[in-house]
């Protein structure tokens, strides 16, 4: 599983980032867009494939929990009426600017 994060040069320097270094990547669930598997993710965003494990329907958006093919659990949101169902294939996308990095020891 790979992802991209957009950070400033100053942040990279302060963190002391090095190639191959272990990092923790975080984002809020509100930054995760869930979409039907057949849709194409926008260019310039991180995206992963998985399967819906839980779906909480709402009046404007549905909360979608998914098990990614890489084994990671993620939660995001889809517009109401997206057609997603529990056990359906899904794509999740996160903009590079929404990913926060932390050092992992």
Task: Map each language-model feature to its residues.
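Glycine/charge-rich catalytic "coupling/switch" loops of P-loop NTPases
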Residues: 2-60, 80-105
